Regions:
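Hydrophobic beta-strand scaffold residues
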Residues: 29, 45, 82-83, 106-108
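Active-site regions of enzymes building and remodeling cell-envelope glycoconjugates
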Residues: 40-50
Length: 161
């Protein structure tokens, strides 16, 4: 059984992942990390990652860039691989992700959906053809007014592809 720490457990994606894992007999969320324990999870929730002394095989992160530095330090110190899905990371944080990945496995993705990852591949292929034909490429995105990171991690990933 894969034991998971859900970092950002009370957010939308944290709850989606919690629901999926709950139905999987081969995985279990053994702890959650979030700024508050809202009492809606079947596992213990810690408001300080350093207080989490639970044994785990992996950390899945859907929190925010504000929590990334401490998460990376924790992951490296405890040698727990991390799936990093937070967006809006600074250049310094991206460098820290790179450095941490030399000590422990880090999978970083701006968007985990199959649709977006298929789109990233299609954009790579289209860019090769269109750029050589003289086309200019532009990304335009629209979000609700409460969007935390703009441009979004997905838009940045599309631009990088």
């Amino acid at each position: 059984m894969v034991k998971i720490i859900m970092h950002g457990c009370n957010g939308h994606m944290g709850q989606v992942i919690s629901g999926i894992v709950e139905k999987d007999p081969d995985a279990e969320i053994v702890a959650g990390i979030d700024i508050a324990d809202q009492g809606k999870n079947s596992y213990p929730v810690f408001t300080d990652i350093d207080a989490c002394q639970v044994e785990a095989d992996a950390i899945v992160d859907f929190s925010s860039a504000k929590a990334t530095d401490k998460l990376l330090e924790y992951s490296a110190a405890r040698q727990i691989p991390v799936v990093l899905c937070s967006t809006g990371l600074s250049e310094e944080q991206l460098a820290k992700v790179e450095e941490t990945s030399k000590k422990v496995a880090v999978l970083k993705s701006a968007n985990m959906s199959l649709g977006i990852n298929t789109l990233l591949k299609l954009v790579q292929d289209a860019a090769k053809v269109l750029a050589t034909a003289g086309f200019d490429m532009e990304i335009v995105e629209k979000h609700h007014r409460l969007k935390v990171d703009a441009p979004s991690g997905t838009a940045l990933a599309l631009a990088d592809s």
